[in-house]
Design a protein with these regions (language model features):
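A structural motif corresponding to the C-terminal end of an alpha-helix
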Residues: 304-308, 416-426
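Active-site His/acidic residue clusters
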Residues: 322, 366-411, 415, 438-449
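Phosphate/adenylate-binding glycine loop and adjacent helical scaffold
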Residues: 497, 501-551
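Transmembrane and membrane-interface helices of multi-pass
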Residues: 1-174
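Active-site-proximal alpha/beta segments of enzymes that process anionic O-linked groups
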Residues: 158-393, 486, 491-510
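Histidine-centered active-site microenvironments of extracellular/periplasmic hydrolases
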Residues: 8-10, 426, 432-473
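Short glycine/proline- and charge-enriched loop/turn segments
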Residues: 279-286, 333, 396-401, 445-449, ...
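A short beta-strand-to-alpha-helix junction
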Residues: 291-298, 399-407, 450-458, 470-493, ...
Length: 551
């Protein structure tokens, strides 16, 4: 073969180097989003995609087909680079989406559109068209992506960009790192926050949690005092939500005897949250293990039933959506019959079109039933959803504002506590939200979206009020500032289970709450894990690498 003809052939091939053309805009948009932490950018797949677009192809027809093929690939890669829910998550939630009302779906679509970003994209388009007249933009695009791949060798590219902040995501309410109680040592977090070390820390955490359990007494003493335990499980309430609507100082919270300031709900969805609460007597499980059999001693209400407490169940909704009631039965072992909702009024309609019953009326009915039942021991689980996103007032097609709904709920609970005080019954009221409402979105997910269990969603206000005491608590609530979760609630209930605290002439509240189990802040949904490590939040999506949670 003639060497000259080979050289001419090679030169002819490289004459078909056409540049990125309009795909420059695709990558420039990604760079802009990455700079402001709106992407979970995967540098190498993007470099491979760029190489595919740049590869010289002599045939005009094949070149055209390459662009047709690149469109779905580019869309899929862009989606993969976002913080949006994974395909598995969307498929798993698909049946629930089908249950949403048409008005709520339209509202979610409208909320999803960020008009500021649409405007910024338009400006970027005009700027690109203007500059591309004189500048070969492909050169700068390739250089930028190659640079991102080079710096990514040392770790995720997103963590090396100037816009990234690793400040704690809980703001003023995020608990500081605390020294664990003796015999309750948490896994060490002294190693550098590499992806491997973070995964090892998570595995150590779950291994440790498997061995933690609340020790309830086998029997109650002869002088034990009967009382009612009422657990009020509120959907969509976090500290961040209360601050967003200025209700963090509502009188309800000042009535509490004990407040957990650093409680972690460990999940952002209702079913898993309720299961975790009903299984509070054992350490924190992974999301996968929530749906696996566990030892019977893990079930809080079963432990109480063995000591003579009658289990009771109340809902202010049907429990049909998302198979919520079914999960309570199967994974939470809550077998008590559902208290009747007949004759209870409703002012709210849920996001799926079903009625939400008046909570004060339900609680008043519960109190009447306890009074008629005498002084026996009862343990009641009450799940309520008036604060859920998409709920609307009866007769309206528009979602009701969160603030008036929260105000009314807090007022109703406040009124009910007054009713309990007047009733003369001995009652332990535990207010423990499932998760937050995500009223304020962040760079990872829009307002109302809870696919990622961010600190603002899982940092929930938990309060305990003891009613009917001979020596009631005086002054402001006792604050538990250490990182806590459901095991601490179970332990506290076990300390109160004999009811003697109601008849004592004085109560040492510090001793009552001393040494409660501490739990590191780790939250998990089906495809996302958010974890505090060395005082900073990190996130892992779909089993990938850990990256700092964008602020």
């Amino acid at each position: 073969m003639n060497p000259n003809s080979k050289t001419q052939s090679d030169n002819a091939l490289w004459r078909y180097w056409r540049g990125l053309g309009g795909w420059n805009l695709y990558f420039l948009a990604k760079f802009a989003l990455l700079w402001f932490d709106y992407l979970n950018f995967h540098a190498l797949p993007n470099l491979v995609f760029m190489a595919f677009l740049l590869m010289p192809i002599p045939s005009q027809r094949l070149h055209r087909w390459r662009h047709y093929l690149a469109i779905p690939i580019g869309i899929a890669l862009f989606y993969h680079d976002t913080w949006l829910p994974g395909i598995n998550s969307i498929l798993s939630q698909g049946s629930q989406l089908a249950g949403f009302s048409a008005q709520y779906l339209l509202e979610l679509i409208n909320r999803f559109i960020n008009w500021q970003m649409v405007g910024a994209a338009f400006v970027l388009l005009i700027a690109y068209l203007f500059v591309a007249q004189w500048v070969r933009v492909t050169v700068f695009t390739v250089a930028a992506l190659v640079w991102l791949n080079i710096v990514n060798i040392a770790g995720p590219a997103v963590s090396l960009l100037p816009a990234t902040s690793t400040a704690s995501a809980g703001g003023a309410n995020t608990p500081a790192t605390s020294v664990p109680a003796a015999g309750d040592a948490a896994p060490a977090d002294s190693l550098p926050p590499t992806s491997a070390n973070l995964t090892a820390y998570l595995n150590q955490f779950y291994e440790r949690e498997k061995g933690r359990v609340t020790a309830f007494p086998a029997t109650l003493p002869a002088d034990a005092q009967p009382f009612d335990l009422l657990v009020i499980n509120i959907c969509s309430l976090a500290w961040a939500d209360m601050e967003a609507v200025n209700l963090q100082n509502h009188p309800l919270w000042s009535k509490m005897d004990i407040m957990f300031d650093s409680f972690n709900s460990a999940t952002a969805y209702s079913g898993p949250a309720a299961i975790r609460l009903l299984r509070a007597s054992c350490g924190q499980l992974s999301h996968h293990d929530l749906y696996q059999p566990v030892n019977q001693q893990c079930y809080l209400f079963d432990n109480l039933a063995k000591l003579g407490f009658k289990e009771q169940l109340m809902l202010d909704h049907s429990g049909v959506f998302g198979n919520f009631l079914k999960e309570l039965r199967e994974q939470g072992d809550m077998q008590a019959p559902l208290m009747s909702q007949a004759g209870i009024g409703n002012e709210l309609t849920s996001f799926d079109g079903e009625p939400i019953y008046n909570d004060l009326e339900l609680l008043t009915r519960w109190l009447d039933q306890q009074q008629k039942g005498g002084d026996g021991r009862t343990a009641t689980f009450f799940n309520i959803i008036p604060l859920h996103d998409g709920n609307r007032f009866v007769g309206s097609s528009k979602s009701a504002d969160y603030q008036p709904r929260a105000q009314k709920l807090f007022d109703q609970l406040n009124t009910f506590l007054d009713q309990l005080e007047k009733s003369g019954r001995k009652v332990v009221v535990v207010i423990v939200p499932e998760h937050g409402a995500a009223l304020v979105g962040d760079k990872m997910q829009m307002s109302g979206l809870r696919d990622i269990p961010s600190p603002n969603i899982t940092h929930t206000p938990v309060g305990i009020k003891l009613i009917g005491m001979k020596a009631p608590h005086q002054g402001s609530p006792l604050q538990i500032k250490t990182p806590s979760s459901y095991l601490a609630l179970s332990e506290l209930v076990s300390r109160l289970v004999d009811g003697k605290v109601f008849s004592e002439s004085s109560v040492d509240w510090q001793a009552l709450t001393q040494g409660l189990p501490q739990t590191p802040v780790i939250s998990e949904n089906d495809n996302a894990i958010v974890m505090q490590y060395q005082g900073k939040p990190y996130i892992r999506l779909n089993g990938g690498d850990w990256v700092p949670y964008p602020q």
